Amino acid sequence: MYAITLIGYLLHTYKDPSRPFSVILAEETENEANGGGTGKGIFVKALGHLSNLVRVDGKNFKVDKNFAFQRVDLDTRILAIEDTRRNVDFEGFYSIITEGITVEKKNKDELFIPYKDSPKVMFTTNYTIPNMGNHAKRRQKVFEFSPYFGASKTPEDVFGHKLFEDWDKDEWNRFFNLMFNCVQIYLESGVLAVENSEKLHRKQVRVQFGEEFLEFLMAQKEEKEVWITMEFLYNEFLKMTGFEKKEYSMKRFSKAIDESCTILKIAYSSTRSKEHSNRKCIKFVETNLVEQIL
């Protein structure tokens, strides 16, 4: 149902100025090396059969580069930035998501398309797109593709024909009916709210802070209700992973603890302890205790 309302939103021209957001097509897999081939490209291609859609290669895309959006026109309805790279600077896209888009074309005057007329923005990625902070979260609607399709099982294997290319009139009519129903359901219900999967959350931590940190955190979080100095925890991390301080700084480690616990919904408390020379200490908290307090 979530996918249906997202399709309806993308196909309809209305954009709510009070709730601007982009659509992110991700994958329900923890390891980005196993990603790809799940159907994100087919999803984008399907939308392009009903809406004026511009596809941009996101691997080497830079939002501040001259002529970055030169293929966008006044009648462009969807801008799909595909295969975005690891740790893409999502903040760099804030203005085109919330305010409008400036289009530069060679040997032509600059054109600004205001928010209400600008294309809706969609990303596809095998990784995750950072969303720490309320600003980023409000500007993202993530849809995860399961690994049902992949290199060993393609849509052609399942359906017995190539999607779109091999369709007859009846198949196209079924497709159009489905897409129009998506728009109708979106108009009735809006875009539904869903929680992202635990796999996506772990992938986000892995991409931002490393596999070694994720493994360390998942082990440490089992030590409940014990105060530990951040310095001790950091040294244990260095010892376990073999990192040097210059490779993984205390500042990065502290940020990783704070942001990863937020992403993974790991409950913890922090304080400055007089018993430990006023150094920062943390302890991981039993979830049911937090729920009782709330």
Residue ranges, per PLM feature:
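Conserved AAA+/SF3 P-loop NTPase catalytic/coupling segment centered on the Walker-B
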Residues: 76-99, 130-136
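Loop/turn-to-beta-strand initiation segments
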Residues: 75-78, 117-121
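Generic recognition of stable, solvent-exposed alpha-helical segments in well-folded globular domains
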Residues: 2-6, 20, 38-46, 88-92, ...
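Catalytic core segments in nucleotide and nucleic-acid processing enzymes
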Residues: 71-73, 97, 103, 111-116
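P-loop NTPase catalytic core of nucleic-acid-dependent motor ATPases
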Residues: 1-75, 141-143, 179, 184, ...
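Short acidic (Asp/Glu) and glycine-rich catalytic loops that position anionic groups and cofactors
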Residues: 19, 24-25, 72-75, 141, ...
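Phosphate-handling catalytic cores of nucleic-acid transaction enzymes
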Residues: 56, 169-211
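Positively charged interface segments
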Residues: 58-67, 87-90, 106-111, 118-119, ...
